[in-house]
């Protein structure tokens, strides 16, 4: 059999990214966030409490990926009800938004939607976290915010991931004095200061020394301590009153910061923000029920449609079988083409809900599988139907069987690059998830046909796919999700396939290199060590164009419940910085 090369050197690393307990477990993208959640569980909190604590902590330790100036989506499983709730706290477009707001002389200007004031959508994270704690949790919000506030106050040493993100976002961060002071260090300062030695004021580097220090700021080296005292104060304020983010002096400061950089966000936009309760999307895969997020995410529909179409091809193939990989790519290509059609905010795009139902139907699964031939279909021959990140993830299962899969984001690395002075709040650049014009691509290369244009109060389309898998007996098996923009459905699908079809240990299921295709560009993205030479040749012989990724895409976090013992096994992507924890 032609298969996939898997370096033996990776196996010992996998073993350090798993934790198990008979009671509860949590997996997040950062050890400090996992420990914050585990601490809440130890203190008697439930899965919702732990997820909220982890989300606030991630806002501190991974500001490039998520924060209280962003938004997200979450599935919450309440065991006593045997019900999955879908909470939408996605950002929305300000009331002054227009379909052509990112066009100049009729052409899209990408920088307008990816950095600065116009890129800022109305944040939903604080309202979403507060609602989750109120509806599903057991602890006061102030208790859930406190671990994050302490991390912000004391500071956290940054890792290589932070350094690389700051390097990528450097031009944007340098445009905002507050963001540059908080997240960068002066040229000539000790950018690699030992933890605890850096940090003047609210997280800036040590005072400059010498003439060379007068230049522009640069990304700190791993080990530098990020201190965010303003954010600590803001978090404690929100713990007492989360509505302070949306009304009053703090809301006016948030709006003023965006408008000072050319944005249209207003205090009235913040006051008008509301979360949405959605109905989860449901599908099936080899005797398991799969729940994921509906529009305004297209990720859940792509994930379920992909799994069901693969099952329609017959019994599970051998691990990394070349014919299976070919089918995976061909089906995913077609699903992403359908995404470009009617998908958008269901409150503004009437066809979005129907498109999601069709994409997750058994009939479409059979049709897509039947369309897979022996050779690759060029993307140009796969048309969308007529139209009518950088992110982070938390998975938790508690002792009562409650579970949360929560994905949160500020969109691109460090969002808009705008920090609200005196608050530590980094604002999102979620407006780039809209289409600047029909047929134009966003930062992830995704195109649309008109249903996802900006409009007042509209939620941008997303790929976030918080997911839960239930066994044939109805019991929870898996809670998982991932960041990664357009690659999220692929990442989550590989996690499900590796657990359900191949019975892999959870850490190996998440750490096995992945492939991805999103219709346009017409390439198969392959992670490092993703395919052996024989498999590459076989796929290329079918007409696929392979593109080697420089690094793994996605950063999945999952908790699995052992059907036989009930033990909770948590795992983090072993090639990243996350670590799971147990109470």
Segment roles from a protein language model:
Residues 345, 458-459, 492, 501-551:
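Extended C-terminal subregions enriched in glycine
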Residues 187, 209, 314-410, 422-423, ...:
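Internal maturation/activation junctions in enzymes
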Residues 5-16:
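Bacterial N-terminal signal peptides
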Residues 277, 388-391, 413, 462-464, ...:
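Short, small/polar residue-rich loop motifs at catalytic or cofactor-binding pockets
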Residues 17-35, 39, 47-240, 245-247, ...:
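Noncatalytic scaffold domains of N-terminal-nucleophile
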Residues 60-67, 71-86, 103, 264-266, ...:
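Active-site rim segments in enzyme catalytic domains, especially the processed small/beta chain
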Residues 291-300, 391, 395, 407-418, ...:
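Glycine-rich phosphate/pyrophosphate-binding beta-alpha loops
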